[in-house]
Regions:
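Conserved subregion of the PPM/PP2C metallophosphatase catalytic domain
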Residues: 1-22, 26-32, 36-194
Length: 194
């Protein structure tokens, strides 16, 4: 199951996250609920500076101690500071977000395992987080839609509204698979710097 969340941490900071729990059905839903409650508890009880790498490291320890080895979740966590326009983030196995800046695309990399990275977001930057239900659907020839196609599609449609981009992505994936039925959960989160 897919997961996303966002919270206002302070008058100047917004926290957002996305994850993807392995598997389907009840067991995946329960693990997703565990991830959500653990994450929310951690950020709601924080005081002062919240270190994204520490949050994800603690979340990983808790999940590792309380779940079967074959169960896991990816997780991306970002905190945007509206005063400085800085995004602090870490990534625990999730697909790297796509940053569109001045018509060019790049992937947000991280420093080491759950390392905290940061980037200054510029006006008109577009950040796209997504789950593998977007990039991994297959066509009749067993070819995945893929990250490269997604990047090109988002670059081409970055001028559209957020809803317009989401609709373009969903339609492209449907056309790729030749079906209106989803092969997996599909989650997109778009953030723009004004």
């Amino acid at each position: 199951g897919d997961y996303f969340d966002f919270h206002r941490l302070s008058p100047k900071e917004i926290c957002f996250s996305m994850g993807d729990v392995a598997g389907k059905g009840i067991s995946a839903a329960l693990l997703m609920a565990t991830v959500q409650s653990s994450f929310r508890s951690r950020i709601q009880n924080h005081t002062g500076h919240l270190c994204v790498s520490e949050v994800v490291t603690e979340l990983n320890k808790q999940l590792y101690a309380n779940t079967a080895p074959e169960k896991f979740s990816t997780f991306f966590l970002g905190i945007f500071d509206e005063e400085t326009s800085t995004l602090r983030y870490t990534n625990a196995g999730h697909l790297p977000p796509i940053l569109i800046r001045n018509g060019e695309a790049s992937l947000l990399a991280v420093d080491g395992q759950y390392g905290e990275s940061s980037i200054l977001l510029e006006p008109k930057d577009l950040l796209l987080l997504y789950t593998d239900g977007i990039s991994e659907p297959q066509n009749d020839y067993d070819e995945m839609y893929g990250e490269d196609r997604l990047i090109e599609l988002v670059k081409k449609n970055a001028h559209l509204s957020d809803e317009g981009i989401i609709n373009a992505v969903m339609e492209a994936v449907k056309q790729w698979t030749g079906s209106d039925e989803l092969q997996d959960d599909m989650t997109l989160l778009i953030a723009r710097r004004s």
